[in-house]
Design a protein with these regions (language model features):
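Conserved N-terminal phosphate-binding loop of PLP-dependent enzymes in the Aspartate aminotransferase
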Residues: 1-242
Length: 242
């Protein structure tokens, strides 16, 4: 959160994947819980199924809404059309952007019929939410994603890619959900060093924290593409050992 303050008023915060901490953070005035199904900026930490199903149950028992942020995880990125579908739950409100527009700026929210009754005209608007060009692009994008069943490819290739990455030297842990992949190295390998080395070798990745890299490959990625990426990362790691 450094560099993004001051934080929005009215929120209480709790440790990720800690259901009891979330329950303890709620009061009689709490109206909703908002959560990312995968913490991408934190180093790719997927929520556990127990955590997500527990949140849904807790919200139901206390008449609270469950809001899920799918801006980064939505539209086939995680091996399902929406990441929450991996957990077998149904949220009350879902926010989405990024993958929805296929490169065009757009934002949208979806809500259950019951929740949407509380909306008035414009109350859920966004700058590019209803722009006709962005909406046309989003419609084409969604049709392409669904017709080509790219969620299944994301799941298959995410598993394949992660299995290959786990075999690389100095890899401490690989975390992924579909094609949202994080690799944590041991203390001898810096994430920024790997990022720069990969960029020199024409592979674009990003670094998070001291020893983590994050990759978000195209949804149409193939095994051959994954193999090339792994080879570049391995070559970069070996160059850093010298």
């Amino acid at each position: 959160q450094v560099g993004f303050g001051p934080m929005t008023y009215g929120f209480s915060y709790a440790p990720y994947n800690d259901l009891k901490a979330f329950e303890d953070a709620c009061t009689e005035n709490t109206i909703a819980i908002m959560i990312e199904p995968v913490q991408g900026e934190g180093g790719v930490h997927p929520a556990t199924k127990e955590f997500m199903t527990g949140l849904r149950k807790f919200c139901d028992e206390h008449d609270m809404l469950l809001l899920i942020d799918e801006v980064q995880t939505g539209w086939c990125r995680t091996g399902a059309v929406m990441s929450y579908m991996n957990y077998g739950i149904k949220p009350d409100i879902v926010s989405m952007a990024k993958g929805l527009g296929g490169g065009m700026p757009i934002g949208a929210i979806c809500a259950t019929e019951e929740v949407s009754k509380a909306f008035t005209a414009g109350s859920h608007g966004t700058t590019f939410g209803g722009h006709p060009v962005s909406c046309a692009a989003a419609l084409a994008e969604v049709n392409e994603l669904l017709n080509r069943n790219l969620a299944d490819n994301a799941k298959k290739m995410g598993d394949y890619f992660s299995t290959k990455l786990e075999k690389l030297p100095h890899v401490k842990e690989v975390r992924h959900q579909g094609l949202l992949v994080g690799v944590e190295f041991d203390d001898t390998i810096g994430g920024v060093d790997v990022k720069h080395g990969c960029l020199d070798r024409k592979l674009l990745i990003t670094a998070i924290g001291a020893h983590i890299i994050r990759m978000i490959p195209p949804l149409i990625v193939t095994e051959e593409d994954c193999d090339k990426a792994v080879a570049i990362i391995e070559d970069t790691i070996k160059s850093l050992e010298k």
